[in-house]
């Protein structure tokens, strides 16, 4: 028996068409939140983990989508929960009724995240680079350091 070492083959790079498709799917995974409430960030993370070694473009776009969706999911949920709790407590003294319109508006803010994710999906499908405001540079720096 010989002493042979086997190494895994180098990952096969994605074609530009496949890169655009997977980047688009990562951004559009935000739509999964409409049905499941949580699957969007999971889908974007899975895409990142599967394709990070095969395409820096897909890695960047999918990690951006994951971070963006996670921030929106946690942040918007916490803010809406607090707004409704304050409104509910204060409604006992009628001041809360004044807070309810604000709580309703805050409840609809996650729709902006859906629209932003769709814009990202459309732009990446067209082959354009998409960068989420405030998140994109941080993700790019994180990937560069890795």
Model-derived regions: residue spans:
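Hydrophobic alpha-helical transmembrane segments in multi-pass membrane proteins
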Residues: 23-43, 66-117
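Membrane-interface extramembranous regions at the lipid-water interface
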Residues: 2-70, 119-146
């Amino acid at each position: 028996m010989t002493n042979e070492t086997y190494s895994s083959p180098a990952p096969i790079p994605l074609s530009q068409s496949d890169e655009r498709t997977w980047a688009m799917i990562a951004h559009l995974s935000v739509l999964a939140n409409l049905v499941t409430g949580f699957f969007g960030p999971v889908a974007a993370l899975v895409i990142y983990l599967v394709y990070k070694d095969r395409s820096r473009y897909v890695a960047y776009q999918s990690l951006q989508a994951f971070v963006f969706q996670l921030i929106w999911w946690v942040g918007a949920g916490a803010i809406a929960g607090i707004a409704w709790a304050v409104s509910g407590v204060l409604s006992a003294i009628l001041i809360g009724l004044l807070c309810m319109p604000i709580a309703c508006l805050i409840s609809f803010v996650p729709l902006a995240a859906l629209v932003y994710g769709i814009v990202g999906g459309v732009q990446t499908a067209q082959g354009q680079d998409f960068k989420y405001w405030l998140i994109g540079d941080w993700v790019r720096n994180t990937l560069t350091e890795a």
